[in-house]
Every structure is written in structure tokens, then in C-alpha cells.
């Protein structure tokens, strides 16, 4: 099962200069809690942008240039990943924008933190087709002068 997890702005802003725009302590703690002891899927740029290793997570990386190491398993494409046994695992898709977009058709669920703010960005979260997903707000929060809500999107079952 693939679950996208991200923090975005009200206009789908995701990142600027290969960095996250918002660093909300409570949201980062939520991210750790949800993804701990699971696989996390990311692109090469997201891997290289991490300030430190995400303890307790197993990395899957999509990259045409990196090679598998003891720290992460590399796939040359999403198609290559989808043909493996990992498809039966709970995998959290953690970015970046291109990986979110490419994984959207295969995603069962999305957990999005949506900040009620806009910001200059050079990377955006893909547009969600509301005919494919049911959404539920699971919480509304305030932190450091920011208001944000957490929404879960679940793919609608085909008739």
C-alpha cells in the first residue's frame, strides 16, 4: 500500500530551493510517528536534501544515477519499483514533487498537512482529482503563528 505524506501550502506549495517551506515541529513529530518502522520512498533530490538520516525508516530511492547502498535501495524508475515485492509493503511516499506526481495513480491514501498560508515556491504538490479520493479533516492546529489542518485522502473504491 502506498501512502503519500506531505506538508503543503494552501496553493499546493511544497518546496523552494530543494528545501521544505514549512518546518512545523508538531508536524515533523507526526511524520516521524507515522513513518517509523516503515519504508519511505523518495527521489534522489529529496534523499540528498535530508539534513540527517531518518532513524527507524528503510529508504527506497528512485534515481537513474545513484546505486544501492547499505542505507538505501535504488530503483531506476517507478515502474521498476512496482514490479518488486515491495508492492505488498506499507510504503510512505515522502517526495519530492515529481515522485508525488508519478506515484499519485498508485496511491491508496494521502496524509496532507495543509498550512493556511502561501509562500514563494518552485515545487508544488500535484493537483488532487477529487473524483478519485474522499477527504476527511482529522484535525486543525495552531503553531508558531501558523494555522494548519491535517487531511486524509482515501482512494474511492471502483464500482
Regions inferred by a protein language model and the residue ranges of each:
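Enzymes that bind and transform nitrogen-containing heteroaromatic metabolites
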Residues: 1-159
Amino acid at each position: 500500500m502506498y501512502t503519500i505524506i506531505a506538508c503543503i501550502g494552501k496553493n499546493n506549495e511544497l518546496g523552494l530551493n530543494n528545501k521544505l517551506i514549512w518546518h512545523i515541529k508538531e508536524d515533523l513529530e507526526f511524520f516521524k510517528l507515522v513513518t517509523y518502522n516503515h519504508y519511505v520512498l523518495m527521489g534522489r533530490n529529496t534523499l540528498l536534501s535530508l539534513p540527517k538520516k531518518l532513524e527507524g525508516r528503510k529508504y527506497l530511492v528512485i534515481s537513474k544515477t545513484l546505486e544501492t547502498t547499505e542505507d538505501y535501495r535504488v530503483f531506476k524508475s517507478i515502474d521498476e519499483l512496482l514490479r518488486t515485492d515491495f508492492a505488498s509493503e506499507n510504503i510512505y511516499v515522502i517526495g519530492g514533487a515529481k515522485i508525488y506526481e508519478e506515484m499519485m495513480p498508485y496511491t491508496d491514501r494521502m496524509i496532507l498537512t495543509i498550512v493556511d498560508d502561501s509562500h514563494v515556491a518552485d515545487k508544488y504538490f500535484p493537483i488532487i482529482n477529487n473524483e478519485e479520493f474522499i477527504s476527511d479533516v482529522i484535525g486543525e492546529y495552531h503553531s508558531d503563528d501558523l494555522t494548519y489542518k491535517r487531511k486524509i485522502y482515501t482512494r474511492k473504491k471502483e464500482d
